């Protein structure tokens, strides 16, 4: 194990000089430095560049407070390695695998895996066409998720990405069991804390590993924490042959941290100030999130859209890797429709008659046609009013508004805020409900009865309570 000395500290960037003739650490190797002689505080650095003349430039995974020139740095000889396997379930830890849930740390002999790995080879991959039921009507009907697929939840600030992810964790864990890995990348610590206690109360935590590198962490930790979560998911997939759910909130923060690191390393910025290696970094992460013949990883990734601009390089680069996209729209939140999923902008590779079946496909496409026609008629309605529409279009507008409201539902995880119990709606009931609305069976019921309900029976009961 070779050792060097700190030559320079500039924020999270630390230059380490090794003696001439010593073996230099490889790129991505973890280096360890202790801030005092008692070794009470350890800081891990990751090698990013070799500057020549025995000097390497590293990125710190923790705050560099207390580091001084001349401190000894040890090369561990391998990348950052984190605990994997059943010991991680029910635990909360950071990018380095150190526990942060105030419980006993992992044992020294716990199995560990390096966070930097190659993606599975082409012949190891598996293609699945099985639908993953979420219990959320708008998703299951119009943009269904594939088991072993990649899903992106796109949306600007405050439109409900994290709440939707929390509801998906709740529904999938309660209804399907299985193992989940939640990775918090550069998001609010408060949300992570809420999620942890919620999972603890519901018992879901026993089948979940949680990894956090939140907003207050240095860019190195925020950039690498997604790889830590992914490494744990890969172990369950490859060694234990499990079907794993990997939740990442938020992929944009991974890109943002990469941009900070790139600037700190002195690289020339690319479009909109992002790192020139944006597509490569995203590809290296996304290509590892896949399903093999041994097991599957279904990933659900929240993706922040800066200023609601979908052409921004960060969300645009992520788009290319996804099977399903769920787009959250601010206009729908203003109308009080939650989840604020845009039924026309969201899409899925799984929405085909071969995968979801003829009836589901026919109902979904007809729902989209009705909503699209309603969108086209909105300008006419705004200028001339409803009276100028043909009888056929008036009927269509009424059904479109009922469909739009029926796409909303109460969430279990939001019950403490709304006071309304959440609902889980099986796919078959979702398809039946929308089919009956399209057939005109509920044209006589008020539009308000369709807002924030579960299955179609709830609409009838709500209308009855309203006196219809």
From Swiss-Prot:
Protein location: Cell membrane
A Pfam entry, by short name: ATP-synt_ab
Catalytic function, reaction form: ATP + H2O + 4 H(+)(in) = ADP + phosphate + 5 H(+)(out)
rRNA-binding recorded as keyword: no
Membrane topology, from the record: Peripheral membrane protein
Binding site for ATP: 155-162
An annotated GO cellular component: plasma membrane
An MF annotation (GO) of this entry: ATP hydrolysis activity
Enzyme Commission number(s) of this protein: 7.1.2.2
Main location per the UniProt record: membrane
InterPro entries: AAA+_ATPase, ATP-synt_VA_C, ATP_synth_F1_bsu, ATPase_a/bsu_AS, ATPase_alpha/beta_chains, ATPase_F1/V1/A1_a/bsu_N, ATPase_F1/V1/A1_a/bsu_N_sf, ATPase_F1/V1/A1_a/bsu_nucl-bd
UniProt keywords, alphabetically: ATP synthesis, ATP-binding, Cell membrane, CF(1), Hydrogen ion transport, Ion transport, Membrane, Nucleotide-binding, Translocase, Transport
SMART domains: AAA
Function: Produces ATP from ADP in the presence of a proton gradient across the membrane. The catalytic sites are hosted primarily by the beta subunits.
Family statement drawn from the similarity comment of this UniProt entry: Belongs to the ATPase alpha/beta chains family.
NCBIfam families: atpD (TIGR01039)
Protein's UniProt name: ATP synthase subunit beta
């Amino acid at each position: 194990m070779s050792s060097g000395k700190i030559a320079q500290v500039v924020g999270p960037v630390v230059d380490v000089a090794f003696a001439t003739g010593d073996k230099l650490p490889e790129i991505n190797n973890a280096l360890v430095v202790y801030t005092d002689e008692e070794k009470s505080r350890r800081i891990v650095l990751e090698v990013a560049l070799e500057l020549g003349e025995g000097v390497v430039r590293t990125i710190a995974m923790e705050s560099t407070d207390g580091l001084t020139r001349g401190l000894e740095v040890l090369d561990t000889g391998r990348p950052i390695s984190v605990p994997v396997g059943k010991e991680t379930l029910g635990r909360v830890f950071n990018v380095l695998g150190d526990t942060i849930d105030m419980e006993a740390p992992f044992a020294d002999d716990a199995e560990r895996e390096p966070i930097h790995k190659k993606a599975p080879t082409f012949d190891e991959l598996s293609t699945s066409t099985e639908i993953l039921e979420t219990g959320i009507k708008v998703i299951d009907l119009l943009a269904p998720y594939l088991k072993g697929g990649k899903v992106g939840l796109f949306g600007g600030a405050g439109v409900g990405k994290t709440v939707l992810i929390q509801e998906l964790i709740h529904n999938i864990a309660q209804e399907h069991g299985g193992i989940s890995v939640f990775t918090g990348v550069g998001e609010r610590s408060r949300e992570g804390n809420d999620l942890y206690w919620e999972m603890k109360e519901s018992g879901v935590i026993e089948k979940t590993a949680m990894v956090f590198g939140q907003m207050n962490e240095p860019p190195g930790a925020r950039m690498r924490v997604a790889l830590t979560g992914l490494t744990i998911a890969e172990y369950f997939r490859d060694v234990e042959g499990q079907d794993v759910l990997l939740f990442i909130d938020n992929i944009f923060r991974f890109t943002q941290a990469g941009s900070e690191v790139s600037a700190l390393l002195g690289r020339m910025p690319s479009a909109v100030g992002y790192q020139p290696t944006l597509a490569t970094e995203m590809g290296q992460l996304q290509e590892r999130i896949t399903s093999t013949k041994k097991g599957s990883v279904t990933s659900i990734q929240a993706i922040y859209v800066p200023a609601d601009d979908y052409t921004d390089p960060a969300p645009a680069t992520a788009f290319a890797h996804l099977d399903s996209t769920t787009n959250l729209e601010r206009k729908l939140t203003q109308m009080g429709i939650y989840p604020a999923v845009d039924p026309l902008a969201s899409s899925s590779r799984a929405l085909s008659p071969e995968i979801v079946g003829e009836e589901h496909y026919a109902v979904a496409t007809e729902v989209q046609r009705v909503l699209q026609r309603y969108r086209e008629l909105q300008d006419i309605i705004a200028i001339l009013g409803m009276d100028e529409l043909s009888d056929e279009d008036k009927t269509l507008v009424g059904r479109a508004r009922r469909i739009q409201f029926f796409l909303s539902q109460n969430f279990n995880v939001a019950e403490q805020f709304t006071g309304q119990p959440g609902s889980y709606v099986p796919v078959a009931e979702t398809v039946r409900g929308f089919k009956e609305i399209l057939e005109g069976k509920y044209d006589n019921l008020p539009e308000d009865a369709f807002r924030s309900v579960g299955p179609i029976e709830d609409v009838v009961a709500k209308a009855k309570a309203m006196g219809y």
